[in-house]
UniProtKB/Swiss-Prot annotation:
Region of interest (Domain IV, binds dsDNA), ranges: 365-487
Record-stated family: Belongs to the DnaA family.
Protein name, per record: Chromosomal replication initiator protein DnaA
Residues where ATP binds: G188, G190, K191, T192
Single annotated GO MF: lipid binding
Record's comment describing the protein's domains: Domain I is involved in oligomerization and binding regulators, domain II is flexibile and of varying length in different bacteria, domain III forms the AAA+ region, while domain IV binds dsDNA.
Amino acid sequence: MMHDALFERFSARLKAQVGPEVYASWFARLKLHTVSKSVVRFTVPTTFLKSWINNRYMDLITSLVQSEDPDVLKVEILVRSASRPVRPAQTEERAQPVQEVGAAPRNKSFIPSQSATAPAAQPMAAQATLRQGGSGPLFGSPLDTRFTFDTFVEGSSNRVALAAAKTIAEAGAGAVRFNPLFIHAGVGLGKTHLLQAIANAAIDSPRNPRVVYLTAEYFMWRFATAIRDNDALTLKDTLRNIDLLVIDDMQFLQGKMIQHEFCHLLNMLLDSAKQVVVAADRAPWELESLDPRVRSRLQGGMAIEIEGPDYDMRYEMLNRRMGSARQDDPSFEISDEILTHVAKSVTASGRELEGAFNQLMFRRSFEPNLSVDRVDELLSHLVGSGEAKRVRIEDIQRIVARHYNVSRQELVSNRRTRVIVKPRQIAMYLAKMLTPRSFPEIGRRFGGRDHTTVLHAVRKIEDLISGDTKLGHEVELLKRLINENNA
């Protein structure tokens, strides 16, 4: 296998999947390091960029490499400074998924770094999306100007979350009933877009609030470097003097000391009526690695789930992407037949739709007459081969809760009323029947219960079903609803 040819093909496919802006921001400095019989290693200039790619893009990178060479079993990301001397120019490079901003009167200035040097210039493709105007020192990755409420596709699955987000951006501290706002959803369903839209709108509001937007990973990195540099107090003072904290990917917040500091910050902001917005890939009560005090405080506000987009939303996303592509190339055209087909076929998330569109846009340059059959062939990795998606415990909880007119939070709570206990036991039973999860893991997903509680619930529902035809029909109906949800 020609290594250079492999990397060129891989890079082209990766750019088609993630889009040119994302590629320029996160993968422009990715280099092929070594290729052995079963392991491919890439290098990046910083530890943080390695962590970012590992957490967000490793599955995609691995699948693309394996599609080029099926013998590859493993893909690794290394830091170049760990494998060879770092040149001076490289030591200034940083890739940090964060935007920190604070607004002075009519001048949107950014809160400067407390413990790090300024980052190197952003790639040209990324510069096009930076906030323009009278901004002060820029630190880390800027807010993406494309992520606004106007560009967010609204539908039945995200309407409540969007309404809450707009209320916070417009009302600020007046939106106390949404404090903290916790948005949870699977990968690619719009959490980051919505959080950045809140930050963008807040900065542009006449209230001139001081806003900090960051990821949980970046929060950990900033505190670690501040502690290392004996500058933690300065960082804490900076964060305490803000009006709006927006933090993404809360599921990645790790470490006892870091969580302790975050808990203090969260308590201080909420007690001072400062707005906090958090997003994660699961509900706050399912974040088992979080300190119970943090989890409890996050549960004290408004938790809203964003579900997968329906057909109308998917079609609108593709239409908007088409409009954006035509701004760059007025002659660009993909037939409505193909757009409709893709909207019906690629159903998992907006991110997969974006990948599908980028793939079609890339292919169109040398295959101008794409047919529906050819599109199916190109997007087979997104459309799937007819296999059902893995059932998630949170899907079971949501469907059971809806069926019995209770909330998911009640299912995982300590309440033991009859109206809650029966649905909870049925949900535990279905979790054991429909997922590969163990009794202890199911117990953790139901509010940290012991595995014996789950075992008791499973045995009890089995016994009841054998003598209660009505309950048996209810459970079969729930199974069908869950399987249809994952079809």
